[in-house]
């Protein structure tokens, strides 16, 4: 079952769920807690490779990914990152999140932002049991105008579901967990599949 605001507050109080920095009481609503945008972004330099072969040899795939991903772009507080129509960018939450082995999280974008064409998490919105780290956001501007994104703006909401029991393989204990303990806008590691 989804956790209510009261249950989320209790989980934060007793350390079952850890969100750092801890959200204000105003950031917790009915079944979710707001998360904010961090200051790190990465973009695709699409002119550097004609394509990425997602089923090709892992070495070639990684080389193509390395050619097309920018280094981390740091945006200071008060300044803006501009996401243009049709562009995809990676970013990271301001908050770091730690979940136990019996709770799964879900990240939803804000309706107000979606109405402007901003997709906050293109497909991967599940936060696995045992997750620890910041959450990478996959932004896509499907609108007609550039969008200014500023560090610490509210960008989405996390909600949580308690499972019937702890999972046998929490994310933070899996040897093949590609994004374990991520603290920055990590690019795709599909070549490690």
UniProtKB/Swiss-Prot annotation:
Binding site for dCTP: 110-115, 128, 136-138, 171, 178, 182
Pathway noted in the entry: Pyrimidine metabolism; dUMP biosynthesis; dUMP from dCTP (dUTP route): step 1/2
InterPro entries documented for this protein: dCTP_deaminase, dUTPase-like_sf, dUTPase_trimeric
UniProt region (Disordered), positions on chain: 174-193
EC number: 3.5.4.13
Catalytic residues in the record: 138 (proton donor/acceptor)
BP terms from Gene Ontology: dUMP biosynthetic process; dUTP biosynthetic process; nucleobase-containing small molecule interconversion
GO molecular function, one term: dCTP deaminase activity
Keyword terms, alphabetized: Hydrolase, Nucleotide metabolism, Nucleotide-binding
Catalytic activity from the UniProt record: dCTP + H2O + H(+) = dUTP + NH4(+)
Assembly: Homotrimer.
Protein's job: Catalyzes the deamination of dCTP to dUTP.
NCBIfam families xrefs: dCTP_deam
Family in the record: Belongs to the dCTP deaminase family.
Protein name per Swiss-Prot or TrEMBL: dCTP deaminase
Organism, as annotated: Shewanella sp. (strain W3-18-1)
Organism placement in taxonomy: Bacteria, Pseudomonadati, Pseudomonadota, Gammaproteobacteria, Alteromonadales
